[in-house]
Amino acid sequence: MTEKLFYKDSHLSKFDAEVLSCVRAKRQQVKDSFGRLDGKAGEYYEIELDRTAFFPEGGGQYADTGVLYMADDDTCGLDETARKKVQVLDVRERNGRIFHITDGFIEAKTAVKGSIDWEERFMKMQQHTGEHIVSGLIHAAYGYNNVGFHLGSEDCTMDFDGEITEEELRRIEAEANKAVWKNLKVFT
């Protein structure tokens, strides 16, 4: 089973790992809810690592993206930008195992350095925390439960089991902003 570093440190953006397996991805495995990876079968690979900080798609949230660098390729001492790398385009979890959908092959037992697209991850963290704040305020004020949540690259939506008026929504927004301005510690 893959060690899930994102549960230990949600701010971790770089990590070391070893490739456990790398196989060609099946066509249905390389399409996400946005249709991002709609290429032909065989163009993408599923890489399983012994540990990862890449958060997989789930819970209404799309997967992290980023890069896997070959750790043993120092390319004459140059930085990561000059190293051999593959793009991590999607991440899926199946039966406790996490698979990174990439645009290139990496041999099993290869040491890699993972680098998460931090700007994207941080944006998702903020939106996810905001969803919890808004949902909690709506539940406390009106008793409605959050029955659906979607965090996408362009928007964030929440579904509740009751109607919320424009006036009520403005009040909730003001209360949510107050909570953010207080800069309270977030526990995960």
Regions found by a protein language model. Name each.
Residues 1-188:
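A glycine- and charged-residue-rich anion-binding loop/surface
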